[in-house]
Amino acid sequence: EFFHGWYMEPLTKGRYPAIMRKIVGSRLPKFNKTEAKLVTGSYDFLGLNYYVTQYAKPKPNPYPSETHTAMMDAGVDLTFKNSRGEYPGPVFAEDANSYYYPKGIYYVMDYFKTKYGNPLIYITENGISTPGSENRCEAIADYKRIDYLCSHLCFLRKVIKEKGVNVRGYFAWALGDNYEFGKGFTVRFGLSYVNWDNLDDRNLKESGKWYQRFINGTAKNSAKQDFLRSSLSSQSQKKRLADA
């Protein structure tokens, strides 16, 4: 509620979530009737970015001070390891010690449908980084990215078919390697390789070729095999993973 509910409750109900009103109290602004009417339903679609999944554990809520932040009010610690020492899925980024959980996109889409009346949704970002230090050949052979994209697209298709979630578009992040805020050029997210010394020098990566086939429909028959390979590769990692 302190993440999505913070803006979705006003947009759909004209008020902040009850838990926020209870915990934050007078520090949380209130909508008057005119404002509530104005903001309710004032969106055309939702653009959702999905990358990783974290566990949440209780954390004492500190008394407000000059260094207090909005996220402190939630009273939780976010972590990639659960109480059994398990990680949610395959490694997302080694340097950040983060992990991804493909099935999480299924739960998030279903949650938004159930909680907020099945709004129109576009997945505006979904992708995985690889080290910027890799040479051209290493960067182009990005089978890890195929694993990531295929597994998430499989669960996205599944939730659309099973739950009727109103997802109308999906954008893989990103079309080409790019400058990342906070990371600069030290990571690569692209389906295409970009030579930073010559921006006209670009090559489609293996993930880009796979994505082309997927969009054109020629990868549908191999999607199950790709997804199986993704699952097997995650299970073969040394770190202990939680059940999917």
UniProtKB/Swiss-Prot annotation:
Subcellular location: Vacuole
Tissue expression as described in the entry: In vacuoles called myrosin grains of a certain class of cells, myrosin cells, distributed in the cotyledons and the axis of the embryo as well as in different organs of the growing plant.
Domain of life from the UniProt record: Eukaryota
PROSITE patterns registered for this protein in UniProt: GLYCOSYL_HYDROL_F1_1
Molecular function via GO: beta-glucosidase activity; thioglucosidase activity
Free-text function comment from the UniProt entry: Degradation of glucosinolates (glucose residue linked by a thioglucoside bound to an amino acid derivative) to glucose, sulfate and any of the products: thiocyanates, isothiocyanates, nitriles, epithionitriles or oxazolidine-2-thiones.
Protein name: Myrosinase MB1
Lineage: Eukaryota, Viridiplantae, Streptophyta, Embryophyta, Tracheophyta
